[in-house]
Amino acid sequence: MASSSSQRRCVFVGNIPYDATEEQLREICGEVGPVVSFRLVTDRETGKPKGYGFCEYKDEETALSARRNLQSYEINGRQLRVDFAENDKGTDKTRDQSQGGPGLPSTTTVTESQKQIGGPVDSNMHQPVGLHLATTAASVIAGALGGPQVGSQFTQSNLQVPASDPLALHLAKMSRSQLTEIISSIKLMATQNKEHARQLLVSRPQLLKAVFLAQVMLGIVSPQVLQSPNIVQAPSHMTGSSIQDAQLSGQNLLPPLAQRSQQLSRAPHSQYPVQQSSKQPFSQIPQLVAQPGPSSVNPPPRSQVKVENAPFQRQQVVPASTNIGYSSQNSVPNNAIQPSQVPHQALPNSVMQQGGQTVSLNFGKRINEGPPHQSMNRPSKMMKVEDRRTTSLPGGHVSNSMLPNQAQAPQTHISPDVQSTLLQQVMNLTPEQLRLLTPEQQQEVLKLQQALKQDHMMQPS
């Protein structure tokens, strides 16, 4: 016990100039407290000093104070290195025996701390790390946290952190062994009491920053790791809702068509299951059913029409049983969209329903209103899908008079300005926005865009 207590009261003093005497060193060590003894180690053969010695104090507190205050004390052009005797006695003896003097680089000694962190062999474990290394490490951390980026090769001109950074200045005065001891203490605390270590670092963010800065200075954390994209960028796998929020915050497509929930009852003979559609940021775009281009051939008798209940909600797929005839004289593609309102006892022949009104996009043209059973005696640009029976009417004639016991919702046309705005939004969809849609929706939007371009070219200038 006495030997252990004596070692804790004794400090190792290294990097002593060869011309310094024991009296000078005793006076220097006596500045922090009473000195019991000081021994300057000399070579047995030559009698010359080896450049280090040992100072014993009366108590451990004085020895600890000497370790803090005498570190980097300058004497005759050298800075003293002070540490506890049991930590550095064997290391410095081995170094001096292999190199023949203090302060020379060693190639045979690797300290335990260097083995743990995998750093290179360095004889200046007790020398101050210096302002350049501290500010360089602080600059790397600042770049990783969003500040100016610093390359892997650092020069004094590349330093982005001001020299007045108090934390960097303080760590610059410490040696590598002291920084290693701090990191080891934090690691030991985290191992023994994880919650206490977490509370300590959270309550003292400067301590957390100092530990991080010390790891960069010692090479435990390399600048290349801090500059990797995984540190400074957000993860690439964003959830669907976050992508939708980001897209919808910047633009809201077809706002009049996304204000109320929509419902469509399934036809009695329908055997198609209800499908759950994936969430799409642009699900407000109505489904386009008509095929562009003049044709005298009827399309397939059973086409599927997707009806969206609301943005980001379920969709229903209802088989359509109407054969739509195309007139060979109709040079304008039939690409109109006619959503109609459907209550809970909904009309099964409705293609789209929206907010209590029927919306018809007829390339900016108004279509004459008429009773629900009135047939149109000219090529039609509107299409209705009937689920109760199959009807084939050439020339685009669609009649609702054959539907029994059904109430027709009142038809209301939106203003030409709104129609023009909606069509313009469809035409201005970017490829990135189209990729967010389903393949069927992409094809239908492309067909509508092509039809709008053809109609615009055919209109007189």
UniProtKB/Swiss-Prot annotation:
Keywords, in A-Z order: mRNA processing, Nucleus, RNA-binding, RNA-mediated gene silencing
PROSITE patterns recorded: RRM
Localization annotation: Nucleus
Extent of Basic and acidic residues compositional bias: 84-96
Predominant localisation class: nucleus
GO cellular component, one term: nucleus
Phenotype upon loss of function: Impaired antisense-RNA-mediated gene silencing (e.g. suppression of overexpression of FCA-mediated FLC repression). Reduced fertility, early flowering, reduced organ size and pale leaves.
Region annotated Disordered, chain positions: 84-127, 260-282
Single GO term (MF): mRNA binding
Highest taxon listed in the record's lineage: Eukaryota
InterPro entries (alphabetical): CSTF2_hinge, CSTF_C, CSTF_C_sf, Nucleotide-bd_a/b_plait_sf, RBD_domain_sf, RRM_dom
One Pfam family recorded for the sequence: CSTF_C
UniProt function note: One of the multiple factors required for polyadenylation and 3'-end cleavage of pre-mRNAs. This subunit is directly involved in the binding to pre-mRNAs, especially on the 3' non-coding region. Required for the targeted 3' processing of antisense transcripts that triggers transcriptional silencing of the corresponding sense gene.
Record's subunit section: Belongs to the CSTF complex. Binds to mRNA. Forms a complex with cleavage and polyadenylation specificity factor (CPSF) subunits CSTF50, CSTF77, FIPS3 and FIPS5.
Protein name: Cleavage stimulating factor 64
